[in-house]
Amino acid sequence: MNKMILCAAITAAFGANAATYTRAGDVEQTIEITKQVQLQAMPSYKVTDNKASGGALVKTTDGSTANLYIGVAPASKGVNSLRIVDTTGALTLIGSLGCGKGVVGNIDSSATLAGNNSIAATCENAPTIATLVTSMDPVSPAPGRYTFKQEYGTYVN
């Protein structure tokens, strides 16, 4: 068989079913893939001479902003009246919420976090979130060791 005839037969057989494309336009979208946010927590609560002070600071390790949260007690009445309860429920630290970059924080009472500090204090699009303690209840707690456990992380609206 002639090679030319064979090529023509193959082209005719496969080319006959080729689709006709009519361009209507283009669709274009740019997506951004960001690196995972790394957080660092630094608790520094203390009681000296029956005066509570210190706080807990959570920050992004690279200074980037994120939606940050930290657990506080359900008895928290607002960002200027936070409650942080120890694991036994015997001591409550009282303070306020601070957010980096001048962000105004919020309380999400619908959050269901683990432990005694089960609602979320939040800072949207901030590099840091902190609880700042100024007092405690009871004012003169019994001598002993008190452990404060607060969940922290990022959230999506």
Model-derived regions: residue spans:
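Sequence contexts marking disulfide-bonded cysteines in secreted/extracellular proteins
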Residues: S96-V103, T122-E124
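N-terminal signal peptide c-region/cleavage motif recognized by signal peptidases
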Residues: A13-N17
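N-terminal small/polar-rich segments of proteins
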Residues: A19-A90, I119-T147, E151-N157
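Processing junctions and N-termini across compartments
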Residues: A12, T92-L93, N116-N117
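Solvent-exposed, low-complexity segments and loops of surface/extracellular structural proteins
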Residues: T112-A114, T122
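Secreted/processed peptides and extracellular or luminal domains of membrane proteins
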Residues: V103-I107, T128-A130
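Sec-dependent N-terminal signal peptides
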Residues: M4-A12
